[in-house]
A protein has these predicted regions:
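Feature responds to low-complexity, polar/acidic, surface-exposed segments characteristic
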Residues: 5, 9-58, 65-86, 92-118, ...
Length: 158
C-alpha cells in the first residue's frame, strides 16, 4: 500500500501486486527512480537492450547517471533479468546509502564481495535482517515484496 501511495508501483495489472514474483532489473531501478521523485535524466542511456520508449528507460538513464548501475556488460542492461537480493540491496545502497563501520554478520556474505558494504548498511539501517539461520541469501531472487519492503524500511519517514 505504501509503495502504491508513493507512486513507486501500481502493481502488475488487474489490481494485483504479485508479491512473490521475482523482481527484474528494470522494475528495481524504476522503483528506485520513482522513490527518488522521478528526476529527469540528463540524457538517455545507450544500452542496446533499453528502448527509449520503454517504461523504464528514464529510470535506467537516471540509475547510470547516479552510479547505481553500469549495466551487465557488452553494452547491455538486461532489463528482464531477475535481480538477486545482493544486486537489489547494492542498487538501494548506491542510491541512498552511506558506508558504515560495521560488517554484515552473515555466513554467506564474504567481506570482499561487491555487496558486503551494501548488506552491512542495510542491516545497520534496519532495511533487512536476512532470511534466517544467519544467512542473507545474496544469490536468491529478490521478490517484488522484498524490494518494496527494503524501500519502505529505507525511506521510512520520507
Amino acid at each position: 500500500k505504501w509503495a502504491q501511495e508513493k507512486g513507486i508501483t501500481g502493481g502488475i495489472g488487474n489490481g494485483l501486486f504479485g508479491p512473490n514474483q521475482p523482481c527484474t532489473r528494470a522494475q528495481i531501478v524504476t522503483f528506485l527512480w520513482r522513490a527518488a521523485g522521478s528526476p529527469e535524466p540528463k540524457a538517455m542511456s545507450s544500452f542496446a537492450d533499453v528502448s527509449t520508449d520503454a517504461y523504464y528507460a528514464k529510470a535506467v538513464a537516471w540509475a547510470v547517471e547516479n552510479g547505481i548501475t553500469t549495466g551487465t556488460g557488452d553494452g547491455k542492461f538486461s532489463p528482464d533479468a531477475t535481480c538477486t537480493r545482493a544486486q537489489s540491496v547494492t542498487f538501494l545502497f548506491r542510491a541512498i546509502g552511506k558506508l558504515v563501520d560495521s560488517k554484515a554478520e552473515f555466513s554467506d556474505v564474504l567481506t570482499d564481495s561487491y555487496y558486503a558494504n551494501a548488506v552491512a548498511w542495510a542491516v545497520e539501517n534496519g532495511v533487512t535482517n536476512g532470511i534466517g539461520d544467519g544467512l542473507f541469501g545474496p544469490d536468491n531472487s529478490c521478490t517484488r515484496a522484498q524490494i518494496v519492503t527494503f524501500l519502505f524500511r529505507a525511506y521510512q519517514g520520507k
